[in-house]
Amino acid sequence: MEFGASIFFTDYSITPAELAVAMEERGFDSVWAAEHSHIPVPRRTRADSELGKRYYDVMDPFVTLTAVACATKRLKLATGICLVIQRDTIQTAKLAASLDQVSGGRFLFGIGGGWNQDEI
């Protein structure tokens, strides 16, 4: 069994490198970075509650995971999830391949369309 953690990295959260080093020291296997490039207004999709501030402020997952790759040796890096329908296909493929290369093959590419109908 492997253990990982997912976080919305923001300018007010722990830094990606700090968290990743602490996770690696404690035996975690992976860190997952969320993605929300924007939150549409108005939102037609109902949520159980108001979205937290982190949804609006989350950093780019490829940037944060590159910081993680540079600070760690074995921790797997994952997008959880990359909203591929909101991204340019060629640029996203290049980002994913670059991160995998920089990390020494530790990148896990989690993809999806998201849950918020207005983002799709």
Annotate each PLM feature.
Residues M1-A71:
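N-terminal beta1-alpha1-beta2 module of alpha/beta enzyme domains
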Residues E2-S13, V84-I120:
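Flexible, glycine-rich active-site loops centered on histidine and acidic residues
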Residues E24-E25, L65-R74, A96, D100-F107:
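Acidic (Asp/Glu)-rich catalytic clusters
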Residues P42, A69-L77, G114-I120:
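Hydrophobic transmembrane alpha-helix bundles
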